[in-house]
Regions:
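Alpha-helical linker/edge segments of TPR/alpha-solenoid repeat scaffolds
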Residues: 48, 108-109
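Flexible helix-coil transition and linker loops at the boundaries of alpha-helical arrays
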Residues: 45-60, 91-101
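TPR/TPR-like (Sel1-like) alpha-helical repeat modules
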Residues: 79-97
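N-terminal leader/capping segments at the start of a protein or of a new domain
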Residues: 1-7
């Protein structure tokens, strides 16, 4: 999947977020400039809020999971472990899946 940053449409639609993979995030990070790498995080954040407001729990959980992964693996800002833990916990509250549980364990280690 080719992830696109758009200021005209700064959200992912549900179909896109559910089809997106961790490899898509990794490829985007490797191919994009620093500004777009950060913009992706904020598009995920905006999408999370949009899906939560619409009670689209699975899509919201996927956004939170991607945010946890992206913070923990790609961006690694100060406090990345704590921030990633916050978002993976949020993902699990919305949609408790084995994939999210495994990431919660990985982040905790």
């Amino acid at each position: 999947m080719n992830i696109q940053i758009s200021f005209d449409h700064p959200y992912f639609d549900e179909e896109t977020i559910l089809a997106m993979t961790l490899q898509d995030l990794d490829c985007f990070y490797g191919a994009e400039n620093e500004v777009n790498r950060l913009n992706l995080f904020f598009m995920l954040e905006a999408s999370l809020h949009k899906f939560q407001a619409a009670n689209r729990r699975e899509a919201a959980a996927r956004c939170a999971f991607f945010m946890a992964y992206y913070l923990f693996i790609a961006l690694t800002p100060p406090a990345s472990c704590e921030l990633a833990a916050f978002y993976i916990d949020q993902a699990l509250e919305l949609d408790d899946t084995p994939e999210y549980r495994q990431w919660q364990k990985s982040i905790a280690e």
